[in-house]
Amino acid sequence: MIEFVYPHTHLVAGVDEVGRGPLVGAVVTAAVILDPARPIVGLNDSKKLSEKRRLALFDEIKEKALAWSLGRAEPEEIDELNILHATMLAMQRAVAGLKIVPEYVLIDGNRCPALPMRSLAVVKGDSRVAEISAASIIAKVTRDAEMAALDLSYPQYGFAQHKGYPTAFHLEKLSEHGPTEHHRRSFGPVKRALGLVC
């Protein structure tokens, strides 16, 4: 992996998203500005960490970061805009919510939303940039908790296990029970469950 070279600036925010692929729930984004004086050991892509480690880092990031913020786009917005544009909107909301305005924003992936400050897309940024790793952890722990809460309301779908992703079990239950109000109606499997496509 090529080492990431940071821009020559002080206040750098990292941004990442969780939940582009699931059939249910919001896409959740986070923006984090870390404090160089309070380093956090063990930051990595949230998907590569155990749930226990993610939860511990989640608390440490919230305590030590100079600023952090969540952004989201709800299923209705995803259906109206499409998942890419909804994700960009959620990222804009996360950056706008920071209590400190960053000088530079590093975004995980290959494209940036329109922002009022300089930004750069970093491919595999969640493994290469500490601020993006921190954002991925904040976003994933938040969205996983939302799926666990949704699981209590709709236990038959197994949301706590698959987090809304289109697993065989989820697709089976979607076919059996139909979609909830939280499902994304523009996604193919949900359309099929509604009888909108063959």
UniProtKB/Swiss-Prot annotation:
SUPFAM superfamilies linked to this entry: Ribonuclease H-like
Top-rank taxon, per record: Bacteria
CDD domains: RNase_HII_bacteria_HII_like
GO CC annotation: cytoplasm; ribonuclease H2 complex
Cofactor: Mn(2+); Mg(2+)
GO biological process: DNA replication, removal of RNA primer; mismatch repair
InterPro entries: RNase_HII, RNase_HII/HIII, RNase_HII/HIII_dom, RNaseH-like_sf, RNaseH_sf
Range of residues in the leader sequence: none
Record domain RNase H type-2: where: 10-198
Locations listed in the record: Cytoplasm
Pfam families: RNase_HII
TM regions (residue ranges): none
Keyword terms of this UniProt record: Cytoplasm, Endonuclease, Hydrolase, Manganese, Metal-binding, Nuclease
Cofactor note: Manganese or magnesium. Binds 1 divalent metal ion per monomer in the absence of substrate. May bind a second metal ion after substrate binding.
Catalysed reactions listed for this entry: Endonucleolytic cleavage to 5'-phosphomonoester
E.C. code: 3.1.26.4
Residues annotated to bind a divalent metal cation: D16, E17, D108
One GO MF term attached to the UniProt entry: RNA-DNA hybrid ribonuclease activity
Assigned protein family: Belongs to the RNase HII family.
Function statement: Endonuclease that specifically degrades the RNA of RNA-DNA hybrids.
Protein name: Ribonuclease HII
Source species of the chain: Enterobacter sp. (strain 638)
Lineage per the UniProt record: Bacteria, Pseudomonadati, Pseudomonadota, Gammaproteobacteria, Enterobacterales
